[in-house]
Amino acid sequence: MSTVHEILCKLSLEGDHSTPPSAYGSVKPYTNFDAERDALNIETAVKTKGVDEVTIVNILTNRSNVQRQDIAFAYQRRTKKELPSALKSALSGHLETVILGLLKTPAQYDASELKASMKGLGTDEDSLIEIICSRTNQELQEINRVYKEMYKTDLEKDIISDTSGDFRKLMVALAKGRRAEDGSVIDYELIDQDARELYDAGVKRKGTDVPKWISIMTERSVCHLQKVFERYKSYSPYDMLESIKKEVKGDLENAFLNLVQCIQNKPLYFADRLYDSMKGKGTRDKVLIRIMVSRSEVDMLKIRSEFKRKYGKSLYYYIQQDTKGDYQKALLYLCGGDD
């Protein structure tokens, strides 16, 4: 017998193919879209002496991802060249990184960022953690499919060979994209039981039962875990984030902190990451670019409002202060406005 929860999950999974672009995205489909015209204008911009970056930026940051795929197709038909390689030759630096990122589908983009985080010597754990902790089941399943297509190997295999210990176990469990979907029924008994088990497995005892933490935090739905973390405070003298800092260290600590923040409030999590990428001397452009590109059609409007609420100034203002030239222009278009 199907439970209401299963039926709802099934609906949300089946409906995924036709979901309209998020109402909270800053980049919307362009109304008078004409792929041929855009392709022609980009071709002209690339051929212009010194390259007409402004036109390239104006077009590609003001089209939805699906529309950009159409432009790339039209461009290739016109010129017999691939749009990404034409733009790679024409552009450079951070602007090139933004524009090439915009040409990939969301899953291709995430897959390539994950691959880059594990390539060569040393792992960029920060990027690995951000992507794996913040993507939904559907997104992760699509990333796994595309990763295999692009790199002829499984994402899980690469994670296993690049990480170790409990950190590896946590990343592998999350990367499967198999957590429960949010149901319509709230199970208060299970909420209480999970909260107590998280406490018993950590702060209450000597040493930490990490597998118990991993199973609860990677298997339960987001909605359920939000309530678990609230309930947790009635058992533990520390909240979940403070408990993590007391119990574990290194990459594992970092991963659990990112995960809990994503579960509690994902737009705020990204607002904090954006702020950290721009505060102090120098800009961590990789993080800045990845979030601006990957969230522009998902929840950028929510991220902007959390950013303003917490930091007192707008995300737009920070980007203006921290970047320059056509790179700045591209990021500001993706931001979608000042608050």
Swiss-Prot record:
Q: Which PROSITE patterns match?
A: ANNEXIN_1 (PS00223), ANNEXIN_2 (PS51897)
In the record, which positions carry N-acetylserine? Answer: S2
S100A10-binding site: annotated segments:
2-24
Report if keyword Phosphoprotein is assigned: yes
**Phosphotyrosine carried by residues:** Y24, Y199
List locations, semicolon-separated: Secreted, Extracellular space, Extracellular matrix, Basement membrane; Melanosome; Early endosome
Record carries keyword Repeat: yes
**Residues joined by cross-link Glycyl lysine isopeptide (Lys-Gly) (interchain with G-Cter in SUMO1):** K49
Q: Which domain of life is it from?
A: Eukaryota
Q: Glycyl lysine isopeptide (Lys-Gly) (interchain with G-Cter in SUMO2) cross-link located where?
A: K49
* Loss of function: phenotype: Animals show a 40% increase of LDL-cholesterol levels in plasma. Increased NLRP3 inflammasome activation in dendritic cells following phagocytosis of wear debris particles. Significantly higher levels of cross-linked fibrin in lung, spleen, small intestine, liver, heart and kidney from 2-month-old animals. Impaired clearance of acute arterial thrombi in FeCl(3)-induced thrombosis model. Reduced migration of endothelial cells through collagen I and fibrin matrices. Reduced ability of endothelial cells to support t-PA/PLAT-dependent plasmin generation. (Microbial infection) Gene knockout results in increased susceptibility to Anaplasma phagocytophilum infection. Macrophages from knockout mice secrete lower amounts of IL-1beta (IL1B) and IL18 following A.phagocytophilum infection. Defects in caspase-1 (CASP1) activation and NLRC4 oligomerization following A.phagocytophilum infection.
Describe, as the record does, how this protein assembles with itself and its partners: Heterotetramer containing 2 light chains of S100A10/p11 and 2 heavy chains of ANXA2/p36. Interacts with ATP1B1. Interacts with DYSF. Interacts with COCH. Interacts (via repeat Annexin 1) with PCSK9 (via the C-terminal domain); the interaction inhibits the degradation of LDLR. Interacts with CEACAM1 (via the cytoplasmic domain); this interaction is regulated by phosphorylation of CEACAM1. Interacts with APPL2 and APPL1; targets APPL2 to endosomes and acting in parallel to RAB5A. Interacts with S100A4. May interact with UBAP2.
Question: Which PANTHER family does the annotation name?
Answer: ANNEXIN, ANNEXIN A2-RELATED
Anything noted about its domains? Answer: A pair of annexin repeats may form one binding site for calcium and phospholipid.
Name this protein carries in UniProt? Annexin A2
Q: Which organism is it from?
A: Mus musculus (Mouse)
Lineage at the top is: Eukaryota, Metazoa, Chordata, Craniata, Vertebrata
What gene name is listed for this protein?
Anxa2
